[in-house]
Every structure is written in C-alpha cells, then in structure tokens.
C-alpha cells in the first residue's frame, strides 16, 4: 500500500520494497520540488537530472541559458530512463551527492 507524501503527484501503480522510496518506504520528502530531464541512468538506483534555467546578466541587460545537474534516487516503482521529464523532491541526504528523490515521471 502506498502512502501519501503530501505532494500533488500520482501514486505509482507498481509496488516496490525500496526503503528509500517515498511512496512504499519510509523516506520523508520536504523542501524544493524541481522538474528536469534525465540525462543519465547508468548508476544503480540513481539518475542524473539536468535542470535548465535563465540567468540575468546585468551588464548586457540580457538573459543567458544555464544548466545544473542534480543526482537523485530512482525508486524501482518509478524507473525513470534517459530522456524522461521527471519531478524530483528534496529529502534527507541519501549519500554524499544525493539529496533528491524522483517522485513523478513523464515518459518521453
């Protein structure tokens, strides 16, 4: 049985036994919710999400494109792949670089 994580995202149909799954495990989510594109899924149980944004350059009064890469935990019930648009939510630190978890996947 999936639990309510407090975000307006659909509950995955597939079940999993991952302890770090926000729906089927005990991982609480809080803080930021970010959307981005999965650029790598080669790590076991993790994905790299690229977030694009605009940065204002005051000298030229223009915007420039920038991007950042965020490592996120990928629960087996969601199974995000390269090219998918995902929503990731902030959680407690899961490792040295992972402090986000995938909560929604929009297949590409």
UniProtKB/Swiss-Prot annotation:
GO molecular function: rRNA binding; structural constituent of ribosome
Domain of life: Archaea
Alphabetized InterPro entries for the sequence: NA-bd_OB-fold, Ribosomal_uS17, Ribosomal_uS17_arc/euk, Ribosomal_uS17_archaeal, Ribosomal_uS17_CS
Annotated NCBIfam families: PRK08572.1, uS17_arch
Functional summary from the UniProt entry: One of the primary rRNA binding proteins, it binds specifically to the 5'-end of 16S ribosomal RNA.
Family: Belongs to the universal ribosomal protein uS17 family.
Subunit structure: Part of the 30S ribosomal subunit.
Matches recorded under HAMAP family: Ribosomal_uS17_A
Annotated protein name in UniProt: Small ribosomal subunit protein uS17
Species: Methanospirillum hungatei JF-1 (strain ATCC 27890 / DSM 864 / NBRC 100397 / JF-1)
Upper lineage: Archaea, Methanobacteriati, Methanobacteriota, Stenosarchaea group, Methanomicrobia
């Amino acid at each position: 049985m999936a639990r309510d994580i407090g975000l307006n995202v659909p509950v995955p149909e597939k079940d999993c036994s991952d302890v770090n799954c926000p729906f089927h495990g005990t991982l609480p989510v809080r803080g930021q919710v970010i959307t981005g594109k999965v650029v790598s899924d080669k790590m076991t149980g993790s994905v790299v999400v690229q977030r694009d944004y605009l940065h204002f350059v005051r000298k030229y009064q223009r915007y420039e494109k920038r991007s950042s890469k965020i490592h996120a935990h990928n629960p087996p019930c969601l199974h995000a792949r390269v090219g998918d648009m995902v929503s990731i939510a902030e959680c407690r630190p899961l490792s040295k670089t992972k402090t986000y978890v995938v909560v929604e996947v929009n297949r590409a």
